[in-house]
């Protein structure tokens, strides 16, 4: 796999508070290799390791995106909900930024039925005004609840190839479903997390909003660049030759 430069600078990570962990009393022993120091009673994440792991993960998602792999981003913290939705739309990823519905992946047959119903209701929106008020109100209420819980995955036709988990403790149900189905996971791991539960751990503060956005934006950039390469390589050869000769 080719190594690329993702402009991951230590000073930017410090500014985003990526390095700040939890109280040392909350440390997960398996996080010891990723911790470089402690400030008063707070563990400090080794940012050189964060930079290396993040860079390697960006290389991997670039390659995956260039091969057409599908991503699901899971981040339900209220403070990052809008950032998750915007980032996912930018990179053409599925996302969950509200409450995770238990069994969303492990009970995929039921989820598919819900998604089919959701898409059907979206198509029916135009005729809601022609329905009796009571019927229209029921459908609007159903549509509202489905949009809230499944809005970010409404066009997901099959299980994702890779899932990005932004908070191991907060999204543990989603992570457990991925483990059960052997879906590869990328995860921010704070000093109180278990790095062994995810396939690609990125040591980082998962409580600081700037930290989450910093990591997410790097991954999204890599996915977007991978998608762009896929678009270019999939063009007919005569078009690529014309562009090259310009």
UniProtKB/Swiss-Prot annotation:
Tree of life domain: Eukaryota
Transmembrane segments: none
GO molecular function: structural constituent of ribosome
InterPro entries (alphabetical): Ribosomal_uS2 (IPR001865), Ribosomal_uS2_bac/mit/plastid (IPR005706), Ribosomal_uS2_CS (IPR018130), Ribosomal_uS2_flav_dom_sf (IPR023591)
A Pfam family hit: Ribosomal_S2
Entry keyword annotation includes Zinc: no
Subcellular location field: Plastid, Chloroplast
GO biological process, one term: translation
Keyword Chloroplast in annotation: yes
Similarity field: Belongs to the universal ribosomal protein uS2 family.
Name recorded for this polypeptide: Small ribosomal subunit protein uS2c
Organism: Pelargonium hortorum
């Amino acid at each position: 796999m080719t190594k690329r430069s993702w402009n991951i600078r230590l000073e930017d990570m410090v500014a985003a508070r990526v390095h700040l962990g939890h109280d040392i009393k909350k440390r997960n022993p398996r996080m010891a290799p990723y911790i470089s120091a402690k400030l008063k009673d707070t563990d400090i994440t080794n940012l050189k390791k964060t930079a290396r792991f993040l860079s390697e993960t960006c290389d991997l998602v670039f390659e995956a995106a260039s091969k057409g792999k599908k991503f699901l981003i899971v981040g339900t913290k209220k403070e990052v909900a809008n950032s998750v939705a915007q980032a996912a739309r930018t990179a053409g990823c599925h996302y969950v930024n509200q409450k995770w519905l238990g069994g969303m992946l492990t009970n995929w047959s039921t989820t598919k039925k819900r998604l089919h119903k959701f898409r059907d209701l979206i198509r029916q929106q135009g005729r809601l005004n022609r329905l009796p008020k009571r019927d229209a109100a029921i459908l609007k209420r159903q549509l509202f609840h489905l949009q809230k819980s499944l809005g970010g995955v409404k066009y997901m036709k099959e299980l994702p190839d890779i899932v990005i988990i932004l908070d191991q403790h907060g999204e543990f149900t989603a992570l457990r479903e991925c483990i059960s189905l052997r879906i590869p996971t990328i995860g921010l791991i704070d000093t109180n997390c278990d790095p062994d539960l995810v396939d690609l751990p990125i040591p980082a503060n998962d409580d600081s909003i700037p930290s989450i956005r910093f990591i997410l934006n790097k991954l999204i950039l890599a996915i977007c660049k991978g998608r762009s390469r896929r678009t270019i390589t999939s063009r007919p050869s005569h078009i690529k030759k014309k562009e090259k000769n310009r």
